[in-house]
Each structure stands twice: as C-alpha cells, then as structure tokens.
Amino acid sequence: MEPILQESDSRFVIFPIKYHDIWKMYKQSVASFWTVEEVDLSKDLDDWDKLTKDEKYFIKHILAFFASSDGIVNENLAERFYVDVQCSEARCFYGFQIAMENIHSEMYSLLIDTYVRDNIEKMHLFNAIETMECVKKKADWARKWISSNKVYGERVVAFAAVEGIFFSGSFAAIFWIKKRGLMPGLTFSNELISRDEGLHCDFACLMFKHLLHPPSKEVITSIIIDAVNIEKEFLTVAIPVDLIGMNCCLMSQYIEFVADRLLTELGCEKSQCI
C-alpha cells in the first residue's frame, strides 16, 4: 500500500506537517484565491458585438466546454481522490481545489450568461455535455477515469492530462484574443483560471512523485497520447482555431509541446508517437 493512501487516524488533524512539499503547494493555492466579483465584464459586450460570427462561435463553444469540465473535475475529487488519499496535507489541497473549481465553473457560466442573449442557445451551451458531440467526447474520457477501477497512480496521470492537456489549447486560444486587445474580462479570467489549473496539474505530478510503485512509463505514455489525440481533434477539427485566425498546425505542435513537458514531469521520455 502506498504511504499516502494508507489509512491512518492522523488524516483527521493537520499538524505536525509530514509532507512539507504538499503543504507548501496547498498554501500556494490558498494565496491565489479570487472570486468572480473581481472580474469586470462591463467592457466585454462592446468587443463581443465587434467579433465575427466565426469568432463568436469559437468562444461560445470553448466556454461551453469549460463550464462543464470543472464539474467533472470536482466529481472526481469528491468521489475518488479525496477518498483515496489519506494524508491531511493532500486533503487540504483537494478540498481547496474543489472550492476553486466551483469558482471557475461560476465564472464560465457567467461569461456565457453575459455574452449569449438568446435563452435557447444559452441552455444549449450550458448542457454542452449532452448537446455537443465534441464536448461530450472529452467529458466521456474524463468520466471514464472517474469510474475506473485502475489504481490511483493511473487515475492521477489521467486527470493531470485533463487539467494539463485538455485545457491548454483553449487557454492558449483565449490568450490569442488578448493579444488583439479584445474582451478584457474574458482574458483576465483566463489568466486567473489558467494559473490555477497549472497549479492543479503540478500538484497531480507532485502526488505522482510520492508514489513508491508508480505506473509503468508505457502506461503513462499511453494515457497522455490518448488525451493528446482527443485535444488535437477538438481544436483542429471540431472547433478549429483557424476560426479566430490561429494556425491549426501550430496549435497541434503546441499541444504536443505541453504533452512532452507533462511526460517529462512524470518521469518519462518525450514520445515520438504524439
């Protein structure tokens, strides 16, 4: 049994700190706290009305994916990871992550509610897991890992991929919009959320490094490649980034770069199959 998964009554108290690196990352997460009220959307609507039909389509579908994905991450945290892990330092992080994912979900829902005036279209976006095949495909992959009977090590790799790969291309696309000087509320919230998700992905890698018996490099690489292929399809075929003037080929390369970095963090070599 992995030490961090070994049941102990010490999980009910925080001190004395045993895993100082995990505790440090928890405190880093707390220091990054923010709320949706800090994001000013008042100037976004003027920019929204200036966007092309394709640009609006792209942003709406990206927001629809994000609005549903944070709830999936939270379900995994509440049902699996918080139950799996027995050290109080990690439970503190997971508990705070749940709170932050709720704020992310609220932010994305508020963005959709602000930009989309038609109520029928709005509900279509809020129910993207059911109404959009491209969003459903990503959601199904993540939910498959929530219900999986695989060991914690494999599941933590999968959710590192969700937060490190499934989100990365969409974050980059919104940063592209920022470079054009548009949508200050959207782009500021993107900065805050991408910072949080980067920390969540780093924490998954940290938890992985605490495993004495991690999954094989072959298993890790297979999980990452699977996520990369789904993300490439999402941003180059289903909702292609060329709708907002980005290069699909370069986006694919960026996703590969992110995946290679994640593989390195997980102790693997860069994959030639990505």
From Swiss-Prot:
Catalytic activity field: a 2'-deoxyribonucleoside 5'-diphosphate + [thioredoxin]-disulfide + H2O = a ribonucleoside 5'-diphosphate + [thioredoxin]-dithiol
Cofactor binding note from Swiss-Prot or TrEMBL: Binds 2 iron ions per subunit.
GO molecular function: metal ion binding; ribonucleoside-diphosphate reductase activity, thioredoxin disulfide as acceptor
Residue positions binding Fe cation 1: D70, E101, H104
Key words of the record: Deoxyribonucleotide synthesis, Iron, Metal-binding, Oxidoreductase
Enzyme Commission number(s) from the entry: 1.17.4.1
Residues binding Fe cation 2: E101, E163, E197, H200
Pfam families in alphabetical order: Ribonuc_red_sm (PF00268)
Top EC class of this enzyme: oxidoreductase
Gene3D superfamilies: Ribonucleotide Reductase, subunit A (1.10.620.20)
Active site: Y108
BP terms from Gene Ontology: deoxyribonucleotide biosynthetic process
Cofactor entry: Fe cation
Subunit structure: Heterodimer of a large and a small chain.
Similarity comment: family membership: Belongs to the ribonucleoside diphosphate reductase small chain family.
Primary role: Ribonucleoside-diphosphate reductase holoenzyme provides the precursors necessary for viral DNA synthesis. Allows virus growth in non-dividing cells. Catalyzes the biosynthesis of deoxyribonucleotides from the corresponding ribonucleotides.
Name this polypeptide is given: Ribonucleoside-diphosphate reductase small chain
